[in-house]
Amino acid sequence: MPYIESILAREVLDSRGNPTVEVEVYTESGAFGRAIVPSGASTGQYEAVELRDGDAQRFLGKGVLQAVKNVIEVIQPELEGYSVLEQTLIDKLLIKLDGTPNKSNLGANAILGVSLACAKAAANYLNLEFYQYVGGVLPKQMPVPMMNVINGGAHASNSVDFQEFMILPTGPTSFKEALRYGAEVFHHLGKILKQKGLPTTVGDEGGYAPDLNSNEEALQIILEAIKSAGYEPGKDIFLGMDVAASEFYDKKLQKYVLASENNKAFSSQELVHYYETLVSKYPIISIEDGLDENDWDGWKYLTQKLGNQIQLVGDDLFVTNTQKLAQGIENKIGNSILIKLNQIGTLTETLETIEMAKKASYTAVISHRSGETEDTTIADLAVATNAGQIKTGSCSRTDRMAKYNQLLRIEDQLVEAPFLGLKTFYNLKK
C-alpha cells in the first residue's frame, strides 16, 4: 500500500530567482510524488499566508527555510503511515496541524507542497496521469488559453496601469491550433513593437512590457498584431484584461488613480463606465479584478453593467476561497473565479471552490502565478476539472511554456477531448 514513508523538502528557485518550496513524498510501495509551489507578485489581502524567513542576509529576506523546516519537522512526523490515496483526510490533517484560518503557522507554501506531492504520489501509485487521478472519468475538455501578451502594472516596469492584456484564441477546434494562433500573434506583436521602436523585453509572465502611452494603446497594438497574423478579432481571437485594480486603488482618496491617464482619479462608477467604453470599442470578453478586492459595492455595479456581456473574474476578490465565493454568489458579484492553488493552500479546498463555482454557473479559470517553476500541475488541473480556461502566461519563458507543452501531451492522450472555444463562456447572455 502507498503509505507515506518519508517527506523531504528543499528550498529551490522560481522564475524570478526567488526561493520557493519543493516537496517530495516517498511511500512504502515505492510510489513517489514531487511538487513545487509558485509565488505571486500582486497578492490578495485575504490569501493564505506564504511563509518567508525575513532574514535580510539571505535572498533579501525571501528565504523559505522555515517553511522547509515545518515540512520536515512538523508535518512529516504527523503524516507518516497515512495512505497517499486519502487526499481529503491528508488535507484536513494539514489544516488542523496549522491551526489558523490563513495557514500562517506552517505556511501555505509548506502545506500546498505536501498536499500536491501526496496527490502526485497517489497518481504514481495507480499508474495514472495526474489529471486522470484528480478528474477520474471527468476529463473531457481542453482549456482555452488566456495568453498574457502585454504585461503592465506589478508585473512590469512600464507606464501601463493594467497588469495584463491577454488574447483568447476561441476560433480553433483544438488546443494545439489555439496555441498556434496565440504564438503567431505573439511573434507578430514583437515585430510591430520593433517597428515602432519599442522594446521587446518581457515581463514576469513572458509578455512584452513596452512603455506605452495608455492602456488603450496596448489594446490597439494587440488588435494590429491579430490582424497582421491573419486572424479576425472578435471571431478567431478575443481580448482579455487583468486590471488588478487593487494595485492602483488609493485607499485615502477611495479612488482609482490611473498614471497613464495623467493620474486621473476615478470613482468606482466612473471606472466601470471606462470599462464599458473599452468593451464597446474592442472585442473584450474577460476582465479580471476590475475593482478593488474590498469594493463590493463597485463590483456589484460592474456586474450589473457588464455581467451578462463579458466574463468578470474575481481573483483578489475571491482568493480561491469558498467563503469569499459564497458571499459573491449570494450578492451576485462577478460571474467567474480565478483559481490559484497557493491562494488557499490545499488540493481539496481548491477542488471544493471549483465545484462551488460551477454549481452557481460561475466559470473557473485555472491560473499560474507570476513567480512560476517547471511544475505543470495547473495544466493537469485545468483538464481534470473541465475548467475550460487556463491562464499561464505568454509564448515565452520555459516556466510558462512547460504548462502549454503539458496540455499538448494531454490532448494527444485524450484524443477526442473537445476544444469548445467560445462555448466555454456558457454563462454570458449577450
Curated annotation (Swiss-Prot):
Cofactor binding, per record: Binds a second Mg(2+) ion via substrate during catalysis.
GO CC list: cell surface; extracellular region; phosphopyruvate hydratase complex
Keywords recorded for this protein, A-Z: Cytoplasm, Glycolysis, Lyase, Magnesium, Metal-binding, Secreted
Binding site for (2R)-2-phosphoglycerate: 163, 340, 369-370, 391
Reactions listed under catalytic activity: (2R)-2-phosphoglycerate = phosphoenolpyruvate + H2O
A GO MF term: magnesium ion binding
Superkingdom of origin organism: Bacteria
Principal location class: cytoplasm
GO biological process: glycolytic process
InterPro entries in alphabetical order: Enolase, Enolase-like_C_sf, Enolase-like_N, Enolase_C, Enolase_CS, Enolase_N
Record pathway: Carbohydrate degradation; glycolysis; pyruvate from D-glyceraldehyde 3-phosphate: step 4/5
Binding site for Mg(2+): 242, 288, 315
Active site per the UniProt annotation: 205, 340
EC number from the UniProt entry: 4.2.1.11
Localization, UniProt: Cytoplasm; Secreted; Cell surface
Top EC class for this record: lyase
Cofactor: Mg(2+)
PANTHER family per record: ENOLASE
NCBIfam families linked to this entry: eno
Homology family: Belongs to the enolase family.
Protein purpose: Catalyzes the reversible conversion of 2-phosphoglycerate (2-PG) into phosphoenolpyruvate (PEP). It is essential for the degradation of carbohydrates via glycolysis.
Stated name of the protein: Enolase
Record organism: Onion yellows phytoplasma (strain OY-M)
Lineage: Bacteria, Bacillati, Mycoplasmatota, Mollicutes, Acholeplasmatales
